């Protein structure tokens, strides 16, 4: 099966903490990890791992973060021919805080994802 996924590509920063902070509050986190993410990239990777031949269509910036955001997709064999860097833009970033119950808060700086258009 061949599949094309159109969507966001980000680098995620994930912090775990016993509980989520309230407005204006600082809490101490247990861990901080960074890894490739984005709704589109996650779907492309999942479909590929289930056996599909996947083409990812998305935007990354022309910054050092772009390669890190694409690394897992590339290493696992997702086709990235339609994920060329966009000059003058940063790659999307997500800040994710997860508590002990699995609840989360997410802030996304979309970067090049926001510049995606029909001509891409």
Predicted regions, residues:
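Glycine-rich phosphate/adenosyl-contacting loop at the front of the ribokinase-like
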Residues: 1-59, 64-75
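Short C-terminal domain-edge/linker segments immediately following a structured domain
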Residues: 33-40, 87-89, 113-115
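Conserved phosphate-binding/catalytic loop of the ribokinase/pfkB sugar-kinase fold
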Residues: 82-86, 96-120
């Amino acid at each position: 099966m061949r599949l094309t996924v159109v969507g966001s590509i980000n680098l995620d920063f994930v912090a775990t903490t016993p509980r989520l902070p309230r407005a204006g509050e600082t809490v101490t986190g247990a861990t901080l990890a960074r890894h490739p993410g984005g709704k589109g990239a996650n779907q492309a990777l999942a479909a590929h791992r289930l056996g599909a031949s996947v083409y990812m269509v998305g935007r990354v910036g022309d910054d050092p973060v772009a390669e890190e955001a694409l690394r897992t997709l590339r290493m696992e064999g997702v086709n990235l021919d339609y994920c060329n860097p966009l000059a003058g833009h940063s790659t999307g970033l997500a800040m994710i805080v997860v508590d002990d119950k699995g609840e989360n808060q997410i802030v996304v700086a979309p970067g090049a994802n926001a510049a995606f258009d029909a001509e891409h």
